Design a protein with these regions (language model features):
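Major-groove recognition helix of helix-turn-helix-like DNA-binding domains
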Residues: 14-31
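Single, function-defining residue in the core of a domain
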Residues: 1, 28-31, 38-42, 57-61, ...
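Short hydrophobic/aromatic segments of transmembrane alpha-helices and their interfaces
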Residues: 7, 53, 233-234
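DNA-recognition alpha helix
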Residues: 1-15
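Short secondary-structure boundary/capping segments within folded domains
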Residues: 14-16, 53-54, 91
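A short, well-structured juxtamembrane/interface segment
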Residues: 45-52
């Protein structure tokens, strides 16, 4: 809209300056990925205001951590750097890059991210990313593939509250049953054979039954919120399913932002990483505009359509390009 207002400077005659594909490619190569990574580190942040609907639970900012993979161009250098995922027959058609993201559930804003080859584990990536990005006002949710004593301990040390699903075979003997049906237990490092350096957790077991079938899904959550009055088990069980907001975020920048393209176009690992940081920054910019629009109307940003916002921005882009630099 700002650019539309400036069109009078050129008498409405400004023409878009078209750069060739070769010029863009050369400029991207000169820029490299590190600048984009540093820019993301400075720009990506939580954006929910204290009164934002759907973004908070009892004073804690709702966050989720998860990972996803993206196909990259099937070039030899990309294949060597990123690697292929396993397939039932042979190997996948494309190498894949792994992206780990810390997301603010209420606004769908990616507040921190990490990019690595396919073979890197999400747990190792989280251990490197989370300690510096978590804060004491956060309640962070994660699925059962993330739990490990060392990562749990690192995340707890940040001061953040955690609500993580764990696998059903994790030994969590009850030590004290609480009034809300949850119970206290202690987790240990698998290397701690003497079991002297454990960490107390609160365990919440529950099942979800599909009304259409007799099948029940069992869930086991652990949290470092030990006081049931501060966060009752029933509320935490319901809250955990807000973690699925992060799946929508991955769908937004993997599918909607890239239209029909399912494979990143960059031909080298450096440019793949640069492209991914660019996508993350563009996604943040869109989500920030949506948050501002929702806040003015007192709405939950979930009420707004990401696809519609993206279309509006795309319609404005040619007008912005019409203003010479």
């Amino acid at each position: 809209m700002v650019c539309e207002g400036l069109q009078w400077l050129s008498g409405g005659q400004a023409g878009a300056l078209q750069a060739s594909k070769s010029a863009i490619s050369q400029a991207r190569s000169r820029l490299g990925p590190e600048v984009m990574k540093q820019l993301a580190a400075r720009v990506l942040r939580p954006m929910a205001r204290p009164d934002a609907p759907g973004a908070w639970y009892r004073g804690w900012r709702l966050m989720a951590v998860d990972g996803s993979c993206m196909d990259v161009a099937d070039e030899a250098v990309n294949a060597e750097h990123f690697g292929y995922p396993a397939a039932s027959r042979g190997q996948s058609a494309f190498p894949q890059a792994r992206v780990l993201a810390l997301v603010e559930c209420g606004t769908h804003a990616v507040v921190a991210a990490s990019i690595a080859p396919y073979g890197h584990s999400e747990v190792a990536m989280a251990a490197e990313l989370l300690p510096a990005k978590l804060a004491g006002d956060m309640l962070v949710m994660a699925d059962r593939n993330f739990y490990g004593f060392k990562l749990w301990q690192k995340a707890c040390a940040s001061g953040a509250k955690l609500l993580w699903r764990v696998k059903s075979n994790l030994g969590l003997p009850g030590q004290h049953e609480l009034a809300d049906g949850s119970y206290l237990s202690t987790v240990y490092d698998s290397d701690d054979r003497t079991r002297r350096s454990g960490q107390q957790v609160r365990v919440i077991d529950y099942t979800l039954k599909d009304s259409a079938t007799p099948v029940q899904d069992s869930y086991r959550l652990v949290t470092n919120i030990l006081d049931p009055e501060a966060a009752p088990a029933l509320e935490l069980a319901a809250l955990y399913h807000e973690r699925w907001e992060i799946e929508s975020v991955f769908d937004e920048f993997k599918t909607h932002m890239r239209s029909a393209s399912t494979v990143l176009r960059s031909k080298t690992p450096e440019l793949v990483e640069q492209e991914l940081w660019g996508l993350l920054l563009a996604h943040f910019a869109i989500r920030q505009l949506m948050e501002q629009a929702a806040w003015r109307q007192g709405l939950d940003p979930d009420r707004l359509s990401f696809v519609h916002a993206l279309r509006v921005i795309k319609r404005k882009m040619p007008q912005a390009a019409a203003i010479p630099p």
